[in-house]
């Protein structure tokens, strides 16, 4: 089983593009709490619906990151997911993390959470 972990922010299209690159059975969507400016839980729910429409039967788990500007909060959430999945028999190479969404701090936390045990998907808006 491949387990996907995606940090999301104001934009979520990158997650759909990423999922097109391979099989999907389970995805964790990590997002911030609702702010005065942006309803991140709503964005996660909307993305959940899009993913389920494209990939019926996929298991989607949404997790709130308490502080999107604190490195430890994102690292702790990813570490917990990683260890829970490992206990369920998922191998290191079956866990992928998309670090292209969320705040810069969340992306950095995701990048350093489990390098090299997991595969990092790096996407660049500068790619042609």
Residue ranges: model-predicted function:
Residues 1-94, 105-128:
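Long, low-complexity, Lys/Arg-enriched
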Residues 97:
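Conformationally flexible catalytic loops at phosphate/diphosphate-handling active centers
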């Amino acid at each position: 089983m491949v387990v996907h972990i995606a940090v999301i922010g104001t934009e979520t299209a990158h997650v759909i593009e990423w999922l097109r690159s391979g099989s999907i059975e389970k995805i964790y969507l990590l997002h911030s709490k609702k702010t005065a400016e942006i309803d991140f839980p709503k964005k996660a729910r909307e993305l959940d619906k899009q993913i389920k429409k494209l990939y019926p039967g996929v298991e989607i788990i949404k997790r709130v990151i308490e502080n999107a500007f604190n490195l430890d909060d994102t690292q702790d959430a990813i570490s917990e997911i990683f260890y829970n999945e490992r206990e369920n028999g998922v191998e290191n190479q079956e866990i992928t993390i998309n670090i292209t969404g969320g705040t810069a701090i969340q992306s950095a936390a995701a990048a350093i959470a489990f390098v090299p045990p997991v595969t990092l998907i790096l996407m660049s808006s500068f790619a042609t």
